[in-house]
A protein has these predicted regions:
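Short solvent-exposed loop/turn micro-motifs enriched in small/polar/acidic residues
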Residues: 12, 203-205, 275-277, 312, ...
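Long, well-ordered mid-to-C-terminal structural blocks that present hydrophobic/aromatic surfaces
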Residues: 253-309
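Active-site lining segments that contact anionic ligands and/or coordinate catalytic metals
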Residues: 261-263, 279-281, 288-291, 314-318, ...
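Dual-mode signal for accessory low-complexity, basic/Gly-rich regions
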Residues: 293-362
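A short secondary-structure junction signal
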Residues: 109-111, 153-157, 233-235, 277-280, ...
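Active-site bordering "gate/hinge" segments
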Residues: 1-263, 394, 400, 410-412
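Extended hydrophobic packing segments that form well-structured cores
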Residues: 367-412
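Short linear motifs in exposed loops
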Residues: 223, 294-295, 405
Length: 412
């Protein structure tokens, strides 16, 4: 385990720069049972920051696997009314959410895929009305991560358990700019300013489309809707006006693509961990915004489930640009966790777009977002496709071609 000093600095970072709890505000912490010490530190930091109430929602992925394996499908598909009432109560109080991630790669491997997909679909449908609170950044939310032995063993398979866990802790600290001697909260303010520079430049160009080409075979044109906005780094919550960082780490500059003007083929550059199933070596072919063909060397059924989750899950909801020479990429680690791996590579997301990435999008209905060529879906699944040789060209309304990436990196 890291020193108490480092853990407390990490907890402070999560509370004050991540979710940025406000005076008197309710904070909901969803946390793994495997790391209670760090969770209690976050709770304490939140109260010291002025939180009015801190609610701990514990989860256990292995216990969840038992439920999914043994409980009847009808039981699992029934999302209890009290769970929806709880979320409605929390959001009515303008709460904020901190999720402490601790993935267990492959934890759902071997389960009946049809049963699993049916359960996830029922849960998404039941909780969809409450996802907009975070997707549209009405309140603050943030995700940070802590290791567990299974995850560390997957990332560092040649090390003994204790060494692997320690090394994963160190890797996580590096991704969030936390050292023994620095002030990580101030470090993140500087980091956010750097990301904002890329956002400003991309927003100035008002590109109509981006063309992606890579050595893996990607040749994809992604249209951008009129009124799209590039974002990244910190955000401002609509209800509380608090500035927060949704993902820690983050290196991306992102926007909502056109739901109808995506054409070509894209090859994933990293595996995708979806609900504990690792989808590997896959590609997608798009026509007029929709996936019309696909293949995965491993877990194709899991990829199929994503694409068929609802009527719009086979369309794109996000395009994100990250230099190949970003700090996380240069670590040359596969984390088997999208929170990290998406920040080592340009990525796309199947499913829902972010309303904030469209002018006045946060106040639009689903129907209005669709009318503005933004996608609406019950899922949002990121996958990585950036490479060392990736080239990206932006095309303006006047037809001018502007280099955006060369050899995997921003040119401006």
């Amino acid at each position: 385990m890291p020193s108490e000093k480092l853990l407390r600095k990490y907890a402070r970072l999560a509370v004050r720069a991540g979710v940025h709890v406000q005076k008197g505000q309710m904070l909901i912490i969803s946390a793994p049972v495997s790391n209670p010490e760090f969770v209690r530190m976050c709770q304490e930091e939140a109260y010291q920051a002025g939180a009015g109430e801190v609610v701990l929602d514990w989860f256990d992925d292995r216990a969840e696997r038992n439920d999914l394996q043994y409980a009847p499908l009808k039981t699992l598909q029934n999302v209890a009314q009290w769970k929806k009432d709880k979320r409605r109560y929390e959001q009515a109080r303008h709460c904020c959410f901190l999720h402490i991630d601790s993935t267990i790669p492959g934890v759902l491997k071997g389960l009946d895929p049809e049963k699993l997909d049916a359960v996830m679909a029922a849960r998404r449908k039941a909780m969809q009305p409450f996802r907009d609170y975070t997707m549209a950044s009405r309140g603050q939310w943030s995700i940070v991560a802590v290791p567990n032995a299974a995850w560390a063993g997957k990332v560092f398979p040649k090390l003994e358990e204790k060494q692997a866990v320690e090394k994963l802790w160190n890797a996580i600290f590096k991704t969030v700019y936390l050292t023994r001697d620095n002030d990580p909260v101030q470090e993140w303010k500087q980091h956010d300013r750097m990301i904002a520079k890329h956002c400003r430049r991309l927003n100035q160009y008002r590109f109509q489309e981006l063309h992606f080409v890579s050595e893996l075979g990607t040749d994809l044109t992604v249209g951008l809707p009129e009124g799209h906005i590039w974002g990244g780094g910190d955000e401002t919550a609509k209800l509380t006006k608090a500035v927060f960082n949704p993902n820690m780490p983050t290196e991306e500059t992102f926007t909502s693509p056109s739901r109808s003007r995506v054409n070509g083929i894209v090859y994933a550059s990293k595996p995708l961990n979806s609900q504990g199933r690792l989808i590997e070596n896959f590609w997608l072919r798009f026509e007029n915004g929709r996936v019309v063909d696909y293949h995965a060397k491993k877990e194709q059924a899991a990829l199929k489930a994503i694409l068929e989750a609802d009527a719009n899950s086979a369309r794109l909801g996000e395009v994100a640009l990250i230099s190949y020479d970003s700090p996380i990429s240069l670590m040359n680690l596969l984390f088997y966790d999208t929170l990290f791996d998406e920040n080592a590579s340009c990525h796309l997301a199947l499913g829902a777009s972010y309303p904030d990435c469209m002018k006045d999008g946060a106040s639009m209905s689903d129907k209005e977002l669709m009318a503005h060529d933004c996608n609406v879906s019950s899922v949002h699944v990121d996958f990585m496709f950036g490479t060392r040789r990736m080239k990206i060209t932006g095309v303006t309304a006047a037809g001018r071609e502007v280099p955006v990436f060369d050899n995997g990196n921003f040119v401006f």
